[in-house]
Regions:
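RNA pseudouridine synthases
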Residues: 1-256
Length: 256
């Protein structure tokens, strides 16, 4: 992918990159080592003077990831030249990890890019736990990723929980920490990191409630921990008290 801009005043290339093309300072530094900048077709450094009428181009091509592309179902809810919104199924990682390089959403997305002739990267703007399903936003290049991260507002989830929250609507303000230094699990603890989640009960039936949840901070397992702390664990959550024998899995869905 390429960004292009025609200068309308005397300035330096760095000013065009930051103000006109809105590249982050981190991306500007990264791209300058890739010979990504040209002015009137000639390679240029960020301190080069730029005059009115000069054409600035930025190549955003990135090295192909070292994990494999895979074919498989991919539910694309929205796509344009900069981003996609994908409906991630339950039980799938968003991105490969050290111990798992296949079977993730990113593997399937690479396969989709190959089939559609797109030389794009995989930059998750939002990440969901393996057992959380719903909407994942992914940028196609580092520039779009930075812009989407900066513009991202509150995320909204729906969750089926055991019990009826009291009050039915409110704010959970409870710090979250590791259960122990070596544990991957979290808990509410006074010495934890600040964590806030808004909740609203949408419906209650037979001792099960449907909640709308908005995490206002971004702690690991935040919604799962907060719901359990509220006394209403998410159904199907085996780690925080909501496991159901033979049930449909963790009932937490990202909706927007």
């Amino acid at each position: 992918m390429e960004l292009r801009c025609t200068a309308d005043r005397e300035t330096r290339l760095l000013s065009i990159l930051r103000r006109e093309l809105q590249l982050s300072s981190t991306l500007v530094r990264r791209l300058k080592y890739c010979s990504a900048y040209t002015v009137n077709g000639e390679p240029a450094h960020t301190d080069r003077p730029v005059r009115p009428g000069d054409v600035v181009r930025v190549c955003l091509d990135e090295p192909r990831p070292d994990y494999p592309a895979e074919d498989g179902p991919l539910s694309i809810l929205y796509e344009d030249e900069a981003m996609l919104a994908v409906d991630k199924p339950q039980g799938m990682l968003v991105h490969p990890s050290f111990s798992r390089q296949t079977g993730t959403l990113a593997n399937r997305l690479l396969g989709y890019y190959d089939r559609t002739g797109q030389a794009c990267a995989v930059h998750p703007v939002s990440r969901l736990d393996r057992d959380t399903f719903g909407v994942v936003l992914l940028a196609k290049n580092a520039h779009a990723h930075a812009l989407l991260i900066a513009a991202e507002k509150h995320k909204t989830y729906h969750a089926a929980v055991r019990g009826v929250p009291q009050p039915p609507e409110g704010m959970i303000d409870a710090p979250i920490a590791r259960l122990s230094p070596e544990s991957l699990l979290r808990c509410v603890r006074a010495d934890g990191q600040p964590a806030r989640s808004a909740y609203r009960t949408l419906r209650t039936e037979h001792g099960v409630s449907l909640l709308e949840l908005q995490p206002l901070t971004g702690r690991t397992h935040q919604l799962r921990v907060h719901c359990a702390w509220l006394g209403c664990p998410i159904l199907g959550d085996p780690q925080y008290g909501g496991a159901e024998s033979g049930g449909p899995g963790q009932q937490l869905c990202a909706v927007s």
